């Protein structure tokens, strides 16, 4: 009898399999017939059968996945008698809270478990889930919150929105399936706006997924809240007028696209619910509740919105009266940062420093930068791509050669105007060429500003560029471009970076590049991060005016003959995942009370009275700490100032970027009257700043010691 039962089940399986294959064949034939008379090719237009082969490949892959899932199911039905019994779908992983997207495709259910303790604490949860299972289609609002008929979506909604179920019954999971992410990156206008981003994500995916797996082993990655996140890339929209999409493969600026690529990878791998758009017209469709200014913020279908300044402007125009209630949800990608003085619209107007980029009146921490140059903003960063591992880099034979940092001819020309010596870069490079062969990677055919002795390779792909860097001993900075990713790539490949020093510092008054940018930063070198946080022996910051110093530096590098790869943890995939996870879990810009900030914790903060004329940024750095603007509020009073062994002649309140502070001439104690102007970077010759300084993890500046989660 058991054998007959087995034969019957095998017969059913074969019959079901043949039926699926037959139906699949009919579907493919119908699709082919429907599109058979259409024009094919990449320029055939929008409503054509372009690349039917790719479509078929996707369909076939989907069929195979479905067949495999059916085999797993039938294997259970037939008591495991099938030969290809490759997995036990009833087995439970110890880390059940982390479900892979591919597992969901294979039919393994997401772990959303109600324990007995949960049921006791939330007695209405089960009955509400039952109601949801019957009624979730009764109103479209449930689907807008992500309810899709699954138990997990019910629990997520009932915990996050209505509070009837425990949040711990589900946790943010990591997703490792690349195909699912690629489905989010399809340009509805067929402009291939995401093309470069898709290529970078795909190329780096194995490293990203490995980093996510390593990080998931830490306790602080469990029980994370899952967020609904809208990502709008304003710079890629047609309305931006910047033509980023059109120029992404023509030598155009890629720094912003690097950051967007890595942010999208990070958010996806951390398991959040993503909506991605580059269409200005689609904004309202993703924010239906934003039309009215009086609706509750809780009714919005998103928790966080990532965009750029262009996108922020588009949001303001599109949603008009509804903007105010969700402005606190914004996180703005802002490469060079926005300082409080420029962000505060009225203050900027009064002081005649208002720019087209500034005056947003957001909290300064809502601006996310590429490098940690201003503690008032949040450091998002990016990932330095690595084509070779450290052992490969160390084993590569280095040649007596150097590579110049400058992929466009105009970059070599710009460097002429950064220094006072008349013969410019040629005199500087002439010194170096006496010791090493000089190579370049300059695009195009016209190289008017490139010295004849430079061996130019043109624009190289990533693998070839990293190979060239790993074979070279020195990476030569010309002074421009400012703060790019290339020096970090060179250092990661073991090359020593010569970082041009600026005397006097570059700023928005003496450099056309910074004119109009909402910052008064003083760039002391081409790459301040490399100068301040990496330094020797990987980075030598020298004045290109001083040719003797240049010569001695090159000799020192070659004599030491040590070329070890180095990459700060914060610029690795794992480092970015850790940092962004901490931000997402702890940063809340929609709390408007004056309570002491819980994150970073108060235990990580040291109050320091700076010398007159020095900013809190510099005061904290000298103590090997970072200025922490979240903790200015508890220092903004007379008691906190007098704790520094000072006696106030009188107390006054004022609105400027220098306070809280002590005036060394008048003995006055001055507190901040406008919290939006609390600033790490303000300084005044007569004032001693009272500074909240925090510890930081070397190689992970955004996080304090002990607050990695």
Regions found by a protein language model. Give the residues of each.
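N-terminal pre-catalytic "stem/leader" segment of glycosyltransferase-like enzymes
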Residues: 7-20, 24-27, 32, 36, ...
């Amino acid at each position: 009898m058991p054998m007959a039962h087995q034969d019957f089940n095998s017969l059913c399986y074969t019959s079901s399999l043949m039926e699926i294959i037959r139906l699949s064949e009919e579907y493919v034939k119908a699709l082919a017939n429907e599109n058979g008379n259409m024009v094919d090719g990449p320029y055939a237009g929008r409503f054509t059968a372009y690349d039917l082969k790719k479509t078929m490949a996707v369909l076939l892959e989907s069929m195979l996945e479905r067949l495999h899932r059916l085999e797993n199911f039938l294997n259970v039905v037939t008591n495991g008698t099938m030969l290809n019994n490759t997995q036990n779908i009833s087995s439970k992983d110890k880390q059940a809270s982390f479900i892979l997207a591919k597992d969901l495709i294979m039919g393994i259910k997401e772990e959303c478990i109600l324990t007995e303790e949960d049921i006791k604490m939330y007695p209405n949860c089960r009955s509400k889930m039952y109601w949801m299972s019957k009624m979730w289609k009764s109103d479209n609002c449930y689907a807008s919150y992500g309810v899709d008929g699954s138990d997990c979506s019910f629990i997520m909604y009932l915990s996050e929105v209505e509070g009837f179920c425990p949040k711990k019954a589900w946790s943010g999971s990591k997703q490792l399936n690349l195909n699912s992410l690629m489905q989010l990156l399809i340009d509805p206008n067929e402009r291939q706006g995401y093309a470069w981003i898709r290529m970078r994500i795909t190329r780096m995916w194995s490293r990203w997924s490995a980093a996510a797996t390593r990080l998931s082993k830490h306790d602080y990655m469990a029980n994370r809240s899952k967020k609904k996140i809208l990502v709008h890339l304003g710079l890629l929209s047609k309305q931006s007028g910047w033509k980023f999409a059109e120029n992404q493969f023509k030598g155009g600026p890629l720094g912003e696209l690097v950051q967007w690529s890595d942010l999208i990878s990070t958010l996806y791998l951390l398991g959040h619910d993503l909506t991605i758009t580059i269409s200005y017209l689609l904004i309202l469709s993703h924010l239906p509740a934003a039309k009215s200014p009086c609706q509750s913020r809780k009714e919005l279908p998103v928790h966080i919105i990532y965009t750029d300044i262009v996108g922020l402007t588009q949001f303001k125009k599109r949603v008009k009266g509804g903007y105010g209630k969700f402005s606190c949800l914004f996180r703005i990608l802002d490469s060079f940062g926005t300082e409080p003085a420029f962000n505060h619209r009225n203050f900027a107007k009064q002081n005649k420093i208002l720019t087209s980029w500034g005056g947003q009146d957001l909290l300064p921490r809502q601006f996310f930068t590429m490098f940690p140059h201003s503690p008032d903003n949040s450091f998002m960063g990016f990932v330095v791509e690595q084509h070779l591992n450290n052992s490969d880099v160390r084993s590569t034979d280095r040649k007596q050669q150097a590579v110049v940092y400058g992929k466009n001819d105009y970059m070599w020309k710009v460097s002429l105007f950064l220094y006072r010596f008349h013969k410019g870069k040629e005199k500087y490079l002439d010194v170096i060429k006496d010791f090493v062969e000089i190579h370049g990677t300059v695009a195009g055919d016209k190289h008017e500003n490139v010295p004849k002795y430079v061996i130019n390779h043109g624009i190289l792909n990533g693998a070839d560029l990293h190979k060239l860097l790993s074979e070279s001993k020195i990476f030569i900075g010309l002074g421009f471009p400012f703060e790019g990713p290339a020096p970090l790539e060179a250092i990661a490949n073991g090359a020593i970076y010569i970082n041009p020093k600026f005397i006097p510092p570059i700023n928005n008054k003496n450099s056309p590049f910074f004119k109009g940018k909402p910052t008064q930063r003083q760039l002391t070198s081409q790459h301040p991060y490399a100068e301040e946080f990496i330094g020797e022996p990987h980075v030598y910051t020298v004045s290109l005016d001083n040719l003797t110093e240049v010569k001695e530096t090159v000799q020192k590098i070659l004599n030491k003959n040590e070329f070890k790869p180095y990459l700060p943890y914060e610029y690795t995939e794992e480092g970015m995942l850790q940092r962004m996870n901490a931000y997402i879990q702890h940063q809340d810009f929609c709390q408007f009370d004056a309570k002491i900030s819980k994150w970073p914790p108060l235990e990580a903060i040291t109050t320091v009275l700076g010398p007159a004329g020095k900013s809190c940024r510099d005061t904290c750095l000298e103590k090997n700490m970072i200025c922490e603007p979240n903790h200015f509020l508890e220092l903004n009073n007379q008691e906190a100032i007098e704790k520094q062994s000072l006696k106030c002649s009188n107390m006054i309140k004022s609105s400027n970027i220098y306070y809280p502070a002590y005036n060394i001439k008048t003995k006055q104690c001055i507190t901040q009257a406008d919290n939006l102007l609390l600033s790490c970077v303000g300084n005044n010759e007569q004032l001693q700043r009272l500074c909240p300084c925090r510890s930081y993890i070397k190689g992970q500046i955004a996080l304090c010691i002990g607050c990695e989660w």
